[in-house]
């Protein structure tokens, strides 16, 4: 029976407790990708239990604590390590490389999956009588209990063993960097794909699953199947994207342009519909040329940031295009990028220094050394 993902035990046989949970999880309307994500997290948990010689239905809070400690101290498997030797931040994109250890979000997600797994068996009376994963509580009991939907959630202290997640600004690609990236693309297919990504703000998997029947050049819209709800939604895209798409479609064999077929195909025979991994490979090749570490999701963030910077586009319009359920999720794109903040403050400081010089004054030196000595050493006024 579906959901097509299983967790195998040391004997190569599916783990019954996980199998029944994943089936129940899938029947509740979850996507196959969500089932895969939960299965991988449960596999990580069961591997820890097997190493510790612990039964899954006899674990305690202490076992969960030891599991979190192991994730904080354990390096990822070599196949998962993508960080090259060198600095922690890419010089081209300004983005950090993937860490060699598990991120706080990964640990928290793993705890959420384990908690849901034991909640299921608690209701089914097939597991321990108490969920071993600590729950976040408020003064009134369960977090979010009696919450007024018109008010924002008030986040109290984290549940035990939950990791502190740093607040990060929304990622986006600066205009100059995007021009360099677009120039490095080698085919009309890749240019059309990226142009749709950066103008429609569609999720990578949503655009990869696009069919040519859902491309409406007349209305400048495409229809995508939303990742979460599964609903089909029309979203706008730029005229440049449709122009590149037409050039790409005209170069395809006639049998691949019949209505209802995939909008994207592999470049070599035998032709196959483009999948998510192949789309990621397009960006990986560009990253090798540019020395960057951009991802497909960066295009979605870039589109959102561009719309947020346009005063003619309301935040509710951005929310609708992005497919966000909560407006608070969209508000993250109202914050400026770090490079924009630095540029703006530098302009302010330069303007202030110029105003002081124009008034006949002398800007205060940030150094305790003589201004003449600093000028001789560094030249000009760049050190100021």
Explain the meaning of each model-derived region.
Residues 280-320:
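Short, basic (Lys/Arg/His-rich) helix/loop patches that form interaction surfaces
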Residues 178, 238-292, 384:
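Active-site/catalytic core of tyrosine-dependent DNA strand-transfer enzymes
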Residues 226, 322-347:
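Catalytic-site neighborhood detector that most strongly recognizes the C-terminal catalytic loop/helix
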Residues 127-180, 225, 266-271:
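Flexible interdomain linker/hinge and immediately adjacent N-terminus
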Residues 19-33, 43-150:
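N-terminal core-binding DNA-recognition domain of tyrosine recombinases/integrases
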Residues 348-384:
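C-terminal secondary-structure termini that scaffold catalytic or DNA-interacting sites
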Residues 200, 205, 209-243:
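Conserved tyrosine-mediated DNA breakage-rejoining catalytic core shared by Y-recombinases
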Residues 165-167, 171-204:
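Basic, Lys/Arg- and aromatic-enriched nucleic-acid-binding interface segment
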């Amino acid at each position: 029976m579906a959901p097509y993902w299983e967790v195998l035990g040391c004997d190569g046989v599916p783990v019954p407790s996980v199998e029944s949970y994943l089936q129940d999880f899938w029947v509740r309307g979850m996507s196959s990708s969500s089932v895969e994500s939960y299965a991988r997290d449960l596999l990580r948990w069961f591997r820890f239990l097997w190493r510790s010689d612990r039964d899954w239905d006899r674990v305690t809070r202490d076992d969960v604590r030891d599991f979190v400690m192991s994730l904080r101290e354990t390096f990822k498997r070599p196949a998962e390590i993508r960080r090259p030797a060198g600095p922690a931040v890419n010089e081209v994109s300004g983005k950090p490389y993937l860490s060699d250890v598990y991120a706080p979000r990964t640990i928290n997600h793993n705890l959420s999956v384990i908690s849901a797994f034991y909640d299921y068996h608690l209701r089914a009376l097939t597991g321990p009588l108490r969920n071993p994963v600590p729950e976040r509580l408020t003064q009134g009991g369960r977090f979010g209990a009696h919450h007024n939907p018109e008010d924002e959630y008030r986040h109290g202290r984290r549940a035990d063993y939950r990791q502190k997640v740093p607040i990060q600004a929304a990622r986006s690609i600066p205009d100059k960097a995007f021009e360099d990236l677009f120039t490095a693309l080698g085919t009309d297919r890749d240019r059309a794909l990226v142009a749709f990504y950066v103008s429609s703000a569609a999720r990578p998997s949503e655009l990869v699953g696009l069919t040519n029947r859902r491309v409406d050049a007349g209305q400048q819209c495409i229809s995508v199947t939303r990742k979460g709800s599964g609903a089909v939604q029309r979203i706008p895209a730029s005229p440049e994207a449709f122009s590149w798409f037409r050039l790409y479609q005209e170069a395809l064999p006639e049998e691949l342009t019949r209505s209802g077929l995939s909008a994207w195909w592999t470049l070599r025979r035998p032709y196959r519909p483009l999948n998510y991994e192949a789309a990621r490979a397009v960006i990986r090749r560009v990253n090798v040329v540019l020395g960057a570490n951009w991802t497909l999701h960066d295009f979605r963030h870039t589109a959102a940031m561009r719309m947020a910077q346009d005063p003619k586009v309301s935040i509710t319009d951005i929310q609708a295009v992005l497919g966000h359920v909560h407006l608070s999720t969209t508000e993250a794109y109202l914050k400026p990028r770090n490079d924009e903040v630095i540029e703006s403050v530098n302009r302010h400081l330069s303007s202030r220094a110029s105003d002081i010089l124009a008034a006949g004054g002398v800007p205060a030196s940030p150094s305790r050394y003589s201004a003449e000595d600093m000028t001789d050493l560094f030249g000009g006024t760049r050190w100021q």
